[in-house]
Amino acid sequence: MRVTVLGAGDAFSSGGRRQSGYLVETQGKGLLLDCGTTTLLALKALGIPAERIDLIAISHLHGDHFGGLSFLFLEYIYEHPRTKPLLIAGPPGTEERVRALHSAMYRELAARGVPFPVSFYEFAPEQKETLDGVEFFPFRVPHQEKDISLGYRVRTDGKAILYSGDCGWNEGLITHSQGTDLFICECCYFSTQTNFHVSYPQIAEQRHRLGCKRLILSHIGREVLERMTEVAIECAYDGLVIDL
């Protein structure tokens, strides 16, 4: 399994980092975890064909996590015409929001539809599901007041990955990290404490309780970048490749 970090930054692209996107590749299968607005840019900068993506799993419906979908659609329509199916999964409301996004950005194009099969699947939190050969356990995390945000424990090709999405610190991260090969955890803040994002001191304090073989911090915010000399946990960067 290979995981490529397409974007390790926050919504503000702090430090010039791209927005969230992680390509998980196994034997003949490509899973994209989140699709921030810079995802297509990242793929092209890294020389990765967009057609490698078979399945997209969105953690929550904020622009820096799903706003790049319209640009992928354009790529698949004009630059590298796609014929194979594309499955887009996410929390409740995903299909409606993706269609609204595409219509807002390219109304006439959206009205014509795309010339390849697109299907949607909306996860029910805490219910295991297998999509296109990939096993998901989606769990709700604290990030939005009303809309559902998800973290994912993903298992495929004999490996397990935990992806926090955006969230405040919660016990689910401890529970679902047990026995995983990789945990990609958001770390937006250093000194700021909120219920909606993880701060570095929080995860440093809880590190010993995590059951992952490898922990990588991502969604790095300005506060963390300004104090990187104090960070003792591995941090993601745009273009990082992780072989498991």
Please report, for each region that a protein language model flagged, where it lies by residue:
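Binuclear metal-dependent hydrolase catalytic cores
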Residues: 1-162, 228-244
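Short beta->alpha connector loops
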Residues: 37-38, 142-145, 167-170, 221-223
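Glycine- and other small-residue-rich loops at beta-strand/loop junctions that grip anionic moieties
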Residues: 91, 165, 218
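Cap/insert and terminal regions of metallo-dependent hydrolase folds
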Residues: 168-244
